[in-house]
């Protein structure tokens, strides 16, 4: 009799917050608890999180942190390579990958007061990092789950990025809206430096990131992801647009 290995669904959450390591609002609570709930359903759910100031120290105190990085990843942005060390931790039963990149992830407040080409760069790195991380680890999830505008470019990259679009078909994506008020709206000149093709900002394509002459990162996620959700059914009802 042939014994078949049981199929395990794998999900990687990409987010700027994950309680208790980094939390500014409800997003951190969701990302901190959802993987544990999925694990109870037999799903291998992990988190990719920036190592903001204090995160590594908290991971050491609250869980198990491997002493040495498992490797490095590099992402090309604005015609230069940004390199991050990748650390692994387990906190409250959740497997977490930490991106240690002090140049980008140095703001203890996490979110910038104003969006411009420099202040959004940490979140673009975070959005592109999964594609490099998964080659490093050899762990391949079926789903990449992005949260809010800060990781909205994950699914957009699979459609329009000059390099990462080659991974289209390798992963399905899910996008969760936690706060519709912040959509990641920025001047369009940044797209070329991030590696997006001109199609990402075509006013002839309603699915593009173009939004009244600006880039709307959340719109790009909604139109390119396989599935999008809101943080709760009641939030969906309040924000529904016909």
PLM region spans:
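Catalytic cores of nucleotide-sugar-dependent glycosyltransferases that transfer UDP/GDP/TDP-activated
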Residues: 1-242
